[in-house]
Amino acid sequence: MAKSQSNKIVSLQTFRDLKQKGEKFAALTSYEATLSSMMCDAGIELILVGDSLGMVIQGHDSTVPVSMEDILYHLRCVKSGNKGA
């Protein structure tokens, strides 16, 4: 796994460079600030926020009911817990 530095901002170019070098990196899913903060402290380089929150958080049978407003809300939550976002 790539060595991460706490609070270091990474970009798409960072991941392209890691892929080109054959280095691995960690990616996990979060929908809220507390977990995002723990992931940041643990050195997770990529935090995913996706429409799966419809099934995981909202209790829907599919991701279809998830709106862009829902995604943006959870992105703000994750960002508030991640000092490097």
What role is predicted for each listed range?
Residues 1-29:
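N-terminal amphipathic alpha-helix/helix-capping segment at the start of soluble metabolic enzymes
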Residues 10-12, 60-85:
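Alpha-helix-loop-beta-strand connector modules within alpha/beta enzyme cores
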Residues 26-30, 47-49, 84:
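Hydrophobic faces of well-ordered beta-strands that scaffold small-molecule active sites
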Residues 28, 32, 39, 78:
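Conserved, mostly hydrophobic/aromatic
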Residues 35-36, 42, 46-72:
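Glycine-rich, proline-tolerant flexible connector loops at the mouths of alpha/beta enzymes
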